[in-house]
Structures are given as structure tokens and as C-alpha cells.
Amino acid sequence: ETGGSGSVSTDLPESGFSACMESASAAYDTRCMLTALADEIVIPNYAQLTDVAKTFADASGPLGSYCSAISTAEESAAFADAETAWKGLVAAVQRTEMHAIGPASDNAFSLQYRLNSYMSGALSTCGVDSIAASSDVEINARALNTRGIRALDYLLFNSNLKHTCAPQVTSTSGWNDLSESERKARRCDAAMLIASDISDAASSIHAAWRAEGGDYRASFLQESNTFQSLQATTDAMFYLEKGTKDGKLGTPLGIIAACPDLTCPGFVEAPYSEHSLQNVITNLEIWNEMFSSNNETGFDAHIENEGWPEVSEAFKTNLEDALELAKSIDTSIVSQVNAIASQSDETECTNAYSNPDTTSDSFPMCTLYGMVKRIVDSLKIDFVTIVNVDVPGGSQSDND
């Protein structure tokens, strides 16, 4: 899938951008740019995610149908349908990763991490196993690193049905003695529980933005909050560095200091489905959309209005190049990490990301890292200077 926003069944209010510009005194207005961003990207993304997550978690939806089909002749076809729906859910979640602003970031990102806890630390596979092995689970009482789309990745795509807990963990003590079909069924039931939690979190964030709910939109677009909202937005967009560049590419590939070994496969975001590259693509696509909100405004217009059209064009070109390469790669991040097996391989990877204008035949994922790094370097210097915002904490210096 492309990660596009697609159709949204939830009724959306008309964008307030045009009305904002009618009262603006110049051809470009920062508050109006933020209005377009909120009304045409952020809120529609949460509306789309709410719809997709609700359908995925419904008992009669694709996941529920797969759970019912386990150990029947329809199991394979039902799983294929569930996998397609899961990809749509993951794409919708990955789009929201780039704008974890306000409600999604409140209380230490508690709602965002219910969607995807990747930025909070490693997935607790034992914790997920415990959910699958237990009855009457209160999902809200479970740790965030046992929930979200990574837990679904483990439950639905890990072919090894044995638990990963230590022997003293009582909840999983009899798990390995269960039949294969029983373990698959219980994992599927756990996936349904986690899918419902994702759906609830998505609905909560969407409601918090809407006028009928928490109306965070009004606060976000209040004239006196323009600078704070601009800063919050650019802080969120730095996910491109910490989440996409470093987390999904640099750390597992062993490029940055966060990985102390040759490679760090444990940091791959979606190791069981091998869907991590598509997540990178979706992140790049939504960042590109946020950079150029619509034909009349966006961060591109902001930068051009400040007198730096060449910087705006460079961002667009570099984003286009990175997306083109990412979509052309026919291997997974897991495979690329496994292929870096020696110091000479590591050197080849280093050369690849240091010279991203030439795609490496052996390690195109390292080339992609270099392309994303090029965008991030411009983000940390040109973008923050021209837009007049601060670099968020933790991004002051590069770490590769």
C-alpha cells in the first residue's frame, strides 16, 4: 500500500484555511498554515485511523473472521484478508507518528504509545505472551510495551508459537503444552483485545481534536498560541530523525552509536511481518504532505516567504529521491541487517550512506539511511533557522 489517507467515512468539517486567509494581511500566514495542517492532514488522519481501527477490531471484521477460521479450510484465505486489513491499520498508525501533537503526546505519549510503542522501548514479547495465555485480561492495566501495532506484528506473524517468558512466569507455564491450533486461537484472541485498545486510543485522540470533544483544535489555532503550536508541530516532525532515520534504519543497521554491536536486529520495528520498510515509506510520505500542506500553503510556503525558495525545493527533491529509492528496494530491513555480517560489510554500508547519490547494490537500505539523513541534516540547520523554531531536546547533535 502507499500509505495514502484514502477515503474517510467520518464526517469532517470543512477546512478553515480559506476563511483564515480572508482575514490575513499577507500572502502567507503562519496561523493559516497551521489551520490547513490541522484541518486537511492531522484531523483527517485521525478520522481515517479511527475508522480503520474500528473495522479491524470489530468481531465481524477481518481479524475476527480469521480468528473464527483457525483450524478450518478457510484459515489461509481468512488470514490473507486479515493481513491486508492489518497493513491498512499499520499505515494509518504510521501516518499519525509524524504529528503526535497535543492529545497524542499528553501524559508522556500514553495515547500515541497505545497505537505504537516503538519509541518507548523494546516490545515485551513475554508480556504479550502473558496476555495470550491469560483469561479475563484487563488490557488497560498492561504495560504499553505489550500493546499497539508491534504486539499485533508478534501475535499474527510470529510462526514460533512457543512463549518467550522465563520458567518462573506462572501465566505462561502451561502454554507450550497446548496444541498448535489452541495457541494460534489464543494469540488471535489477544490480537483482538489489542486491536480494540488501538481503536479506543485512536478514537480518543480524534475526539480530543474535534469541536464536539476536547476541541484541542481551538487551542492549537488560537492566535496567541501560534508560536507554541508551530514549535509543537516541528517537534513532532523531528520523528523523521529519531523514529525513522535512527530507530527504523540507523540502529538496526548498526550505523549509529545506539547500536553497540555490528548490527542490532532487536531494534527492527516489525521483525515478524518484515513490514518495516513500508513503515519508513509511510513516514516519508506523511512528512512530505506536512511539509507542503496544500497548493497554497505549507512549510514550503513559509520557507519561500522568508526568501529561501532553493531550500524549499531542495527538501522536495530530497524527499522525492528518498521515496523513489525506498519504493524500489525489494528486500526487507531484516534481510539487510542479517546481510551485514562482517567488518567489510559494515564498511560497505558506511560508504553507502556516506555517498547516497549512488545506490549500493548490496546495501540499498544503507543508501536510504544516507538519503533520509540528508533531509534530517537540512531539517536541523536550514529548516529550524528559517522557520525560527528550536531543535527539540535530544536532537542537538547527530549521533552517527
PLM segments and residue spans:
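Mature extracytoplasmic or organellar-lumen-exposed domains after removal of signal/transit peptides
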Residues: 12-400
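Ser/Thr/Gly/Pro-rich low-complexity, disordered linker/stalk segments of secreted
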Residues: 1-15
